[in-house]
Amino acid sequence: MITPPDVFKSLSDETRARATLLIASLGELCVCELMCALNDSQPKISRHLAQLRSNGMLLDRRQGQWVYYRLNPELPSWVHEMLQVTLQANSQWLADNALRLKNMDGRPVRDSVCC
């Protein structure tokens, strides 16, 4: 079971916090979408996602050569609630990331090829 210190430690890095909130907002994102939204390299994004996955915050699924990430549905309800409150109270903090993602060329359609 994930504890409050585990959650807050996971979200203490800005890249992990932004990625987690974007995933919480949109349901599921692949590495290439997060690269675009966060304007970061694939190795950096993948490293942070691996950390979030290893501590139980995220689950992944492979579709061909692409990996998609989503919140772990077995997280305690307080984690989901905290993420939703954070999203609602801080939409401006993620506005640039959301805009980059919205304007992404070749954005993947689920169940098809990414990027």
UniProtKB/Swiss-Prot annotation:
GO biological process: response to arsenic-containing substance
Pfam families for this protein: HTH_5
Domain HTH arsR-type: 1-90
GO annotations of cellular component type: cytoplasm
Keywords recorded for this protein, A-Z: Arsenical resistance, Cytoplasm, DNA-binding, Metal-binding, Metal-thiolate cluster, Transcription, Transcription regulation
Location of this chain's protein in the cell: Cytoplasm
PROSITE patterns named among the record's database cross-references: HTH_ARSR_2 (PS50987)
Superkingdom to which the source organism belongs: Bacteria
Coiled-coil segments: none
Documented applications: Could be used to construct robust and highly sensitive arsenic biosensors.
GO molecular function: DNA binding; DNA-binding transcription factor activity; metal ion binding
Residue sites binding arsenite per the record: 30, 32
Cross-referenced Gene3D superfamilies: Winged helix-like DNA-binding domain superfamily/Winged helix DNA-binding domain (1.10.10.10)
DNA-binding region(s) in UniProt: 31-54
InterPro entries linked: ArsR-like_HTH, HTH_ArsR_DNA-bd_dom, HTH_MetalResp_TranReg, WH-like_DNA-bd_sf, WH_DNA-bd_sf
Subunit record text: Homodimer.
Role played: Binds arsenite and regulates the expression of arsenic efflux pumps. In vitro, also binds antimony and bismuth, but not arsenate.
Stated name of the protein: Arsenic resistance transcriptional regulator ArsR2
Biological classification of the source: Bacteria, Pseudomonadati, Pseudomonadota, Gammaproteobacteria, Pseudomonadales
